[in-house]
Every structure is written in structure tokens, then in C-alpha cells.
């Protein structure tokens, strides 16, 4: 079977880790990081890529719901596969050793960092620095308006990045924001299944011509 994987650049290191030890690898096309912030553009980009690669048997996206950026996608002549998660953070928080009991383990009031997210142009630390440089003594008030609802910054350790670098980033964030820092264990389990093609209930597998819907991402009806 000829397979194509279209992946978010935010997951580059995790995908590389998932590929380790695999004797046969599918073709992988990496997309720019940060597309989740522009769902309409993401959908347009993915639609074009899907249309341009109808010569394969299966197209697999590492994108989940991503702000509804994948809803409506159709692959006319190939199977289309997506992880049944709202976003990449939800994917990385999932661990097969624990199983899945809810739609997402993301908690209200928590900011999540990975090695990929701290490299984003609009990272939390990048915004804190920019706002402070731009607004000076008024910066704390602006930062509170944006991040006042958060109390914890969680560093996700997937084993794919230099965790010390990510923790240092989190510590710098805590200099700007009154947050406590925690380190939590994530995984590349979903990406490993994407690479191997060994899908379970955490994946949406569509036949040619079927469209992605929001309902497909629900867990136990929610």
C-alpha cells in the first residue's frame, strides 16, 4: 500500500522519534508550524495537497480537528485518515499505557509547552517579550488580560526534545506571568500508529469520497 503522511511542523521532532526503528517509512510532507491559528487557510492548504496526491492508496494527516480546519475535507480516490483528537497537544498527552477516558486531557487554566511549541513565532514567551518591549510599565496589565485565566504552565516531555530547553522556556514565562511550572509525561504513541498504519479507535478512517465531520471527533458522544 502506498501511503502519504501530511504532518504539522509543530510535531517534527515527535514524528522523527516515531519513525525510529521502522524498516519501511511512508512519504512525509511537512507543513509550516502555526497553521492551527488559521483554520480556513489550513483547510485550503490541506485540500490542495489531498487533491494533488490522488495517486496514493491512503493519505494520513497528523492534524486533528484543529479549530475545525479539517472539517469538510474529502479525498475522492484514496482513504483519508486522521487522529481522533482536537489538536496536537491532546495527541501528545495521550498515553497508551493509561488508555483514554475522555475527549482531551487538556485542563482549564493550564498552558502547555513542547519543544515544538516554544519554537513557534507566536509562542507564549515570544508574546510576553513583545508586549513588555512594546508597552513597558503597562505590560503587566495587558499580560493579565490575556493570560489571567491561567495558573500553571505544563512542560510536556515526549522524549523527542531537549526537555531542559523547554523547561528553561517555561521558567522564563514564569518571570512574566504568575504561574507555577510543572513537568508532565506525554508520548508519541499516536504518531507511532500513524507511521506504522496500525490504527485503533483513536483514528478516523474515511473511505474515498467521504467527508470529515466534527461529530467524528467526539468521544462517547461528547
State the predicted function of each range.
Residues 1-22:
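N-terminal basic/disordered segments at the start of proteins
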Residues 6-13, 35-36, 60-71, 86-88, ...:
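Gly/Ser/Thr-rich loops at beta-strand to alpha-helix junctions
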Residues 25-41, 183-185:
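A short beta-strand-loop structural module common to alpha/beta enzyme folds
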Residues 44-55:
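Short, well-structured alpha-helical segments in soluble
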Residues 56-60, 64-71, 112-127, 206-222:
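Extended, charge-rich low-complexity interaction segments
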Residues 78-123:
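Long, charge-dense
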Residues 106-173:
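Active-site rim beta-loop-alpha module in soluble metabolic enzymes
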Residues 144-222:
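Extended, basic/helix-rich recognition subdomains
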Amino acid at each position: 500500500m502506498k501511503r502519504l503522511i501530511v504532518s504539522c511542523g509543530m510535531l517534527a521532532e515527535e514524528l522523527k522519534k516515531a519513525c525510529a526503528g521502522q524498516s519501511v517509512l511512508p512519504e512525509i510532507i511537512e507543513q509550516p508550524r502555526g497553521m492551527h491559528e488559521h483554520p480556513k487557510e489550513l483547510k485550503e492548504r490541506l485540500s490542495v495537497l489531498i487533491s494533488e496526491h490522488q495517486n496514493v492508496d491512503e493519505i494520513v494527516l497528523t492534524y486533528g480537528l484543529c479549530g475545525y480546519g479539517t472539517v469538510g475535507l474529502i479525498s475522492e480516490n484514496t482513504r483519508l485518515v486522521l487522529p481522533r483528537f482536537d489538536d496536537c497537544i491532546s495527541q501528545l498527552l495521550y498515553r497508551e499505557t493509561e488508555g483514554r477516558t475522555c475527549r482531551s486531557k487538556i485542563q482549564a487554566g493550564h498552558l502547555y509547552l513542547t519543544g515544538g511549541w516554544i519554537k513557534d513565532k507566536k509562542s507564549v514567551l515570544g508574546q510576553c517579550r513583545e508586549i513588555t518591549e512594546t508597552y513597558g510599565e503597562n505590560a503587566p496589565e495587558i499580560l493579565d488580560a490575556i493570560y489571567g485565566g491561567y495558573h500553571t504552565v505544563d512542560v510536556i516531555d515526549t522524549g523527542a526534545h531537549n526537555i531542559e530547553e523547554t523547561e528553561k522556556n517555561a521558567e522564563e514565562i514564569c518571570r512574566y506571568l504568575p504561574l507555577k511550572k510543572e513537568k508532565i509525561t506525554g508520548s508519541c504513541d499516536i504518531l507511532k500508529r500513524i507511521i506504522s498504519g496500525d490504527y485503533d479507535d483513536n483514528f478516523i478512517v474515511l473511505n474515498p469520497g467521504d467527508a470529515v465531520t466534527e461529530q467524528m471527533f467526539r468521544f462517547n458522544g461528547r
